[in-house]
């Protein structure tokens, strides 16, 4: 199926060819060739108008010149108050003087948004358990996709997303921004160039989740909130703000960290939240982007709370065929970020603290790197630029828009994103099962472990989830 954007691109190319051959007069308006014409702007929709979309994704897509080539023209959320709030944020007119987001393009059911042929791509920023189904259905509808991390909650879901993107020839980008941030890129370059010798260990530090709010365990479903749709493939349970997202006084918008991020029915916790970012950098530094561990084991502490039950302190080890290990723990043990350790004790650290500067410290002790963008055990490791530099793409939301326009290549190839997602899922499963798991990365199966293999997909409520799409994807 040819999308609106692809039709415009091909039509412009055909007209340009006729101009070059003299088949049509040279005095043709620039808009006919698609230059700044309304039809040539990338039309985007948002599925999930909460914190991440409102504060990060939508503004980032539009900045750095993005406004010149894309518009958000449709919105969807099960909570219509959030749709209205996002519409106000995007208040404006298109090049023909029309409202960018019309009343007819504000939806409570995302499937209506996907059915709109005017939309070229969708930004999916919903609770984690919705990611796979929505991404697959968006690809099938001919939309390119920006999918928030984690990519999926199971290994089977991740493979199904990858299969759908390939089958329907869609650009699908995941929200792992460290591929576009200088300090993480340069740390990977230093490691891959052997500046710390053979890597024997990578330490990944992730934050803890917040304490549970003192909300009731059951509340009336708010007006304009489709609770059944919010639950999707998960079991039917009573509504409470402790399960979904908060609201401020008198129903005002509240874009604090949503409550669902702390419940195992809906997410995997920090192992796949911040872990999705840090594990990607760790795996990239080891050169295992298209590989996987041979085993994983882990333990964790599950907090005793009324409802919020994701893991607290964790201790997970992924072991690779090279002998290198990735170890993940909370920031009580490791600083938030990624530290590569070489066989002779040299190391490089990179973390969330802004961009690299010339004054970034070297020669600091490993327990003093918290809050630093990049640091190393001694001088000479991180100062010099890379002999073979890695790609320096633009900010990852804006990069997705550019990838839609040019049709690639992807700064974060989808196969690599799926492998990072798989690593996070493996860590979560090791904690849940409480034992060592042996993994065959090529077959994407556990070795001699029927119980673990039975968890490659989740149980799903009738009418929801990815299993209904497996046959069309050739996976059933």
Which residues does each predicted region cover?
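Non-transmembrane alpha-helical segments in soluble domains
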Residues: 8, 62, 84-87, 111-114, ...
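Residues that mark the start of a beta-strand
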Residues: 41-45, 198, 325
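A contiguous active-site-proximal alpha/beta segment in oxidoreductase catalytic domains
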Residues: 144, 152-232
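Short basic (Lys/Arg) and small-residue
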Residues: 149
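Core domains of carbohydrate- and sulfate-ester-processing enzymes
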Residues: 203-253, 358-360, 455-460, 467-468
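Rossmann-like dinucleotide-binding domain that binds NAD(P)(H)
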Residues: 228-322
């Amino acid at each position: 199926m040819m999308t609106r954007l692809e039709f415009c691109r091909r039509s412009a190319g055909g007209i340009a060819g006729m101009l070059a051959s003299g088949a049509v007069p040279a005095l043709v308006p620039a808009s006919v060739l698609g230059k700044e014409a309304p039809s040539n702007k990338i039309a985007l929709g948002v599925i999930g108008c909460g914190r991440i979309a409102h504060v990060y994704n939508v503004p980032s897509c539009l900045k750095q010149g993005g406004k010149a080539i894309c518009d958000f023209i449709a919105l969807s959320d099960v909570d219509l108050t959030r749709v209205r709030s996002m519409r106000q944020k995007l208040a404006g007119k298109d090049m023909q003087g029309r409202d960018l987001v019309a009343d007819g393009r504000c939806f409570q059911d995302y499937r209506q948004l996907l059915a709109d042929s005017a939309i070229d791509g969708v930004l999916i920023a919903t609770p984690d358990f919705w990611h796979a189904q929505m991404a697959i259905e968006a690809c099938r509808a001919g939309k390119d996709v920006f999918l928030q991390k984690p990519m999926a909650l199971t290994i089977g879901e991740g493979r199904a997303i990858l299969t759908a993107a390939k089958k329907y020839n869609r650009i699908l980008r995941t929200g792992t921004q460290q591929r576009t941030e200088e300090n993480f890129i340069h740390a990977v370059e230093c490691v891959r160039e052997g500046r710390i010798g053979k890597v024997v260990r990578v330490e990944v530090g992730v934050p803890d989740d917040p304490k549970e709010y003192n909300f009731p365990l059951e509340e009336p479903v708010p007006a304009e909130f489709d609770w059944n749709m919010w639950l999707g493939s998960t079991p039917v349970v009573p509504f409470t703000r402790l399960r979904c997202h908060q609201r401020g006084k008198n129903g005002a918008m509240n874009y604090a960290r949503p409550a669902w991020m702390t419940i195992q029915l809906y997410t995997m916790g920090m192992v796949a939240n911040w872990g999705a970012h840090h594990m990607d950098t760790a795996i990239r530094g080891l050169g295992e982007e298209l590989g996987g561990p041979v085993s994983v084991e882990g333990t964790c502490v599950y907090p005793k709370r009324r409802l919020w039950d994701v893991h607290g302190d964790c201790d997970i080890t992924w072991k690779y065929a090279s002998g290198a290990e990735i170890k993940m723990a909370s920031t009580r043990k490791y600083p938030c970020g990624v530290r590569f350790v070489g066989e002779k004790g040299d190391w490089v650290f990179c973390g969330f603290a802004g961009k690299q500067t010339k004054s970034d410290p070297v020669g600091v002790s490993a327990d003093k790197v918290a809050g630093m963008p990049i640091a190393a055990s001694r001088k000479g490791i991180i100062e010099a630029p890379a002999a073979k530099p890695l790609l320096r793409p633009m900010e990852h939301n804006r990069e997705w828009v550019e990838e839609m326009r040019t049709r690639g290549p992807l700064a974060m190839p989808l196969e690599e994103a799926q492998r990072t997602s798989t690593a996070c899922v493996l860590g979560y499963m090791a904690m849940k099962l409480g034992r060592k798991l042996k993994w065959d990365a090529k077959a994407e199966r556990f070795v001699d472990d029927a119980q673990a293999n039975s968890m490659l997909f989740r149980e799903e409520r009738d009418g929801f989830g990815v299993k209904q799409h497996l046959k069309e994807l050739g996976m059933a």
